[in-house]
Design a protein with these regions (language model features):
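Structured catalytic-domain cores with a bias toward divalent-metal coordination
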Residues: 2-417
């Protein structure tokens, strides 16, 4: 039973090189989705080991894509690059340095450059229809997605362009200000929901009108329109409703994007997801359940079945992290203090091993009297003096299928501009 460091020590697999992952890769081999988490958005070790896992799943188990907690339109340039598609940039570094929306460090870092260049090299050996993709799945950067829809239609279908432009003119008074739009809607009760939905339905229902577009380009067009549509709802609900409504709106968008990618890659496709533990660890086994919040981990288990999904968390006892002191503030390297007592991090730190992972099984799950522990959760905004508030009450072996632990972690290596 999952109860103490002494019991847990019998289950650990030390991280001593790529071969340490053998058991995990075999466990993940036949899953439809493998979700890889992180306890922060700015930790080197989380990115490094997610990279190692992703490479092996792709090279050895034929996984088809990686979907990350990032913007769809801007990160699609990286997808073009790793697939060597028309319009691709000259290097992953060049593309990632063009990212502009805060927090840029989440993807504009050396760790992602290394993964992207490996993907490019791996894909160069494959036919075009088997190349592995890299996609953003988040709901943000909607004005860029709106521009991409219009720019693509302008050169492919003048009638469609005119129709979509008329629909999107609903946003014209707000000129790129989504919060301004949401506040205006809250006051006037007039919104653009019908307009954005009309665009999605027009593109989805008229595939024959876009016959000159490849499946990849059509997917790009449709998915950008979905971003605009779901972002409209997300911002509107953020102002008008309680927090769980907008949170769940964003979650359903990300989950929907992952499902769309599974459909894009066809029967027997398999995907990898990179996102915060808050998104990939099953919300049913955290305090999120009490507020009605869901997440991707929960929805994928419900949709695909527990046996077809692997949820892998990442966490640490202490270390350094890249984060911002407030939303939009310049990033800085911060110190994460030692984990609080009654946390899984405090428990795992008692084990005399610098880094390791555990794979949970039915013997670890106590359905009658589950043990609730804190689980570190550092966001892009972080205040180390309030670190004790950054722990999510969690039933660990039920929230995750596996958990990686590091005694001390270091900050992401951000690209220099």
């Amino acid at each position: 039973m999952f109860s103490s460091a002494q019991n847990l020590e019998q289950k650990i697999i030390p991280l001593e090189g790529d071969a340490s992952l053998d058991k995990l890769i075999l466990t993940a081999a036949n899953k439809e989705l493998v979700l890889l988490g992180e306890a922060s958005h700015g930790t080197h070790e989380y990115y490094l080991w997610r990279d190692k896992i992703s490479r092996r799943l792709i090279a050895e188990q034929d996984f088809n894509f990686i979907a990350v907690e990032g913007d769809f339109a801007s990160l699609y340039h990286l997808n073009r690059y790793v697939k060597n598609m028309d319009g691709a940039g000259n290097s992953a570094r060049e593309i990632l340095l063009k990212l502009h929306r805060w927090p840029t460090w989440m993807w504009a870092n050396e760790e992602v450059v290394a993964l992207a260049e490996w993907l490019r090299s791996h894909n160069d050996k494959l036919p075009q229809d088997r190349k592995v993709g890299f996609y953003g799945m988040d709901v943000y950067d909607e004005w860029n997605s709106k521009k991409e829809v219009l720019d693509l239609l302008k050169v492919t279908d003048k009638a469609a362009y005119k129709y979509v432009e008329e629909q999107y003119n609903c946003f014209y008074p707000h000129k790129g200000d989504s919060w301004g739009y949401a506040n205006a809607v809250d006051t006037s009760k007039k919104n653009c929901a019908n307009a954005t939905r009309n665009v999605v339905e027009y593109i989805r229902d008229n595939r024959e009108n876009f016959s000159t577009l490849s499946d990849d380009t059509y997917f790009y067009l449709l998915q950008n329109s979905i971003v605009v549509d779901n972002a409209e709802e997300f911002y509107r609900e953020s102002v008008a409703s309680v927090g769980r409504v907008s949170w769940n709106s964003r979650v359903h968008h990300m989950h929907g994007t992952v499902n769309d990618l599974l459909n894009l890659y066809g029967e027997k496709s398999k995907g990898i997801v990179w996102a915060h533990n808050t998104h990939i660890g099953d919300a049913e086994y955290t305090s999120m359940r009490n507020t009605g919040e869901v997440n991707i981990g929960q929805l994928t288990r419900e949709g695909l079945g527990n046996n077809n999904v692997l949820l892998i968390g990442f966490t640490s006892f202490e270390g350094n992290v890249m984060a911002g002191p407030s939303w939009g503030a310049p990033m800085k390297e911060m110190t994460i203090p030692p984990a609080v007592t009654n946390s899984i991090e405090h428990e795992l730190n008692q084990i005399d091993q610098e880094s390791f992972y555990l794979i949970f099984d039915e013997k670890d799950k106590d359905y009658e009297n589950p043990k609730v522990m804190g689980n570190r959760a550092v966001g892009v905004v972080y205040n180390p003096t309030r670190d004790e508030r950054q722990f999510e009450p969690t039933i660990v072996p039920m929230r995750y299928d596996a958990l990686f632990f590091f005694k001390k972690t270091t900050a992401l290596r951000v690209l220099k501009r």
